[in-house]
Structure formats: structure tokens, C-alpha cells
A protein has these predicted regions:
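A conserved ligand/cofactor-binding region detector
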Residues: 1-296
């Protein structure tokens, strides 16, 4: 799948656009929930212009760099105009990046997804099997719409008892096993596990694509290479890229690293949208504390 989501960096979110779960709205916490979300949105929207002014003061346009040239070094009118437009865009983006900490996790957003029928089928199965009501509803609505255009490809999409039951039983098991264990403090980013043969794997895979040798033989050859020889292969394979948009070829994906990341929700959403990775998230919590940007 290829998803695209409304950005908290470039779009000011409207007041009142947050989810109201039936379980909360039918409980004694309904008024408190609505009041809290409304107050967060009021704080967010009321500070957009003041925060933009703060950003302009802290990062003035005179030091703004466009194409390697500072604003106060520019003389061409067209260049100055482009720089002013780019500067104001960066001011707005930085201000909204800071203020997104006010947005509750219940903030609703727009997501567009491009995928083939099989990917949609699996996605809907996961959505319709989720513990959250709003996620299940999205899965059902997606199924209704896709059934109009690719009915034969999504007709088997249905809730999975395996997914729902596994989540339920694993949550109960984890609670029983770990509830008495105190949560240990840790750094925000921890390299939990890494591939000790990463260099060998990448170099062997890089050579594999351009040879007819079996991988096992190439691994033995690479193990006998000097560090300089292996680095030469890596440089030839990846070193000619001119920008981050030119992704390395697939051999680079044969090395694996496992990180445990403790972050605020906004930072996680940025991470969630990018990179080739397998993500295993935990539920949102304040067990580890919370972040407040110094600018706020």
C-alpha cells in the first residue's frame, strides 16, 4: 500500500474535528472528554499566529538560506520574492510542528491509499478485526466502497478471529505476567538488536545480483576480503547516489537492526509514514511521562 495523510506540519486543523467514541460518549466521562478536546483545539488555534511571530523572531529571515545563499546576500528581486515565500512556508511549518503537541490523539485526519486488490483485502481484514470501534468502522466502509469497483478482489475480506482473539489473549497474558513488574527507564532510542554479519550480508548480496555464484559461495568469498575491499564494493553500490530520493538497490535491505524508540505521538507519526521497516507499536501511554516543546 502507498498511503498519504493530511499533514500536521502544513495544514491548520479545524476546531471540533476529533473522534467521539460511543463508549466514551455513552459514559459519565462524555462531558469531560468533549471539554478537554475543545480546550486543546482552542489553545492550538489561538496560538498559530503568535507562534509564527515567535518563530520569525527566533529565526529571522536575514539568516534564511535558499540555494546556499543567505537572504541578506540577495539582490535580485525575483530571488528575494522566492526567498520570502520559502521563508514564510518554513515559518508556518515550524510553528505548526511545535503546536501539534496540543492536538489530541483523537484528532481526525484524511488518509488516501493506493494499493492493489490483494493489499486492500488484507488491510480490510486487519481493520475489521481491530479492537477499536472507529478502526472497524473504517474497514467496513472501505469494504462497501471497494465492492462497487473491484467486488471480485475484495469479496473474501472479513474479520479475522485469529487476529482479534490473539490480540485479546495476548493482552490478558501480558497483563497477568507483567503487571507487577516495574517499567524500567530507558533512553529514547535503544539499539535492541543488530545483525553481526550485516557487512557480509550486504556485500555478498550486492555481488550476487551481478554474478551467477550461489549466495553461500559469495559469503565465503566476502569473509576473506579485506575491510578495504568490502568498503570498495559498498562505495560502488551506494556511493554514486546524488540525493536521498535515489534509494540504494535491494542488497542494502539485507542488513537488519532492531530499535526500541520512545517518542511523542507526533514524532512517531512522522516515523510511521516513512522508510522500509516493520513496526510493532505499543498503546499510547503517559507511563513514561510526556513532552512539552520549550517553545511552548
Amino acid at each position: 500500500t502507498s498511503p498519504l495523510e493530511k499533514s500536521t506540519r502544513y495544514v491548520v486543523f479545524e476546531k471540533g474535528k476529533y473522534y467521539r467514541p460511543a463508549a466514551i460518549m455513552n459514559s459519565k466521562f462524555a462531558d469531560e472528554y468533549v471539554q478537554m478536546c475543545d480546550e486543546l483545539f482552542v489553545a492550538y488555534s489561538s496560538k498559530v499566529e503568535p507562534m509564527k511571530a515567535f518563530v520569525r523572531e527566533k529565526w529571522p529571515i536575514a539568516a534564511f538560506d535558499l540555494g546556499g545563499k543567505k537572504f541578506n546576500e540577495m539582490t535580485d528581486e525575483a530571488e528575494l520574492k522566492r526567498a520570502k515565500t520559502a521563508y514564510e512556508s518554513s515559518v508556518r511549518a515550524r510553528a505548526l510542528d511545535i503546536l501539534r503537541y496540543y492536538l489530541p490523539a483523537a484528532t481526525v485526519t484524511n488518509i488516501g491509499i493506493t494499493a492493489n486488490g490483494r493489499a486492500f483485502e488484507y488491510l480490510m481484514m486487519k481493520l475489521m478485526s481491530d479492537e477499536l470501534e472507529e478502526v472497524r468502522t473504517i474497514g467496513q466502509l472501505m469494504h462497501q466502497e471497494l465492492s462497487k469497483v473491484i467486488p471480485s478482489l475484495v469479496k473474501r475480506a472479513a474479520p479475522s478471529s485469529y487476529i482479534s482473539e490473539t490480540k485479546k489473549t495476548m493482552r490478558a497474558f501480558a497483563a497477568a505476567k507483567l503487571s507487577a513488574v516495574r517499567i524500567r527507564k530507558q533512553p529514547t532510542v535503544t539499539l535492541a538488536r543488530y545483525d553481526k554479519d550485516a557487512e557480509i550480508n550486504v556485500v555478498a548480496a550486492a555481488l550476487y545480483q551481478f554474478s551467477h555464484h550461489p549466495l553461500s559461495q559469495l559469503r565465503k568469498i566476502v569473509k576473506k576480503m579485506t575491510a578495504e575491499e568490502k568498503m570498495k564494493v559498498v562505495d560502488e553500490y551506494m556511493g554514486k547516489r546524488t540525493s536521498r530520493r535515489e534509494r540504494p538497490l535491494r542488497a542494502a535491505e539485507t542488513a537488519y537492526y532492531q530499535f526500541d524508540v520512545l517518542s511523542d505521538y507526533g514524532a512517531y507519526r512522522d516515523l510511521q509514514r516513512h522508510r522500509v521497516m516493520t513496526q510493532i507499536p505499543q498503546l499510547l501511554t503517559v507511563e513514561h511521562g510526556y513532552d512539552v516543546p520549550p517553545e511552548i
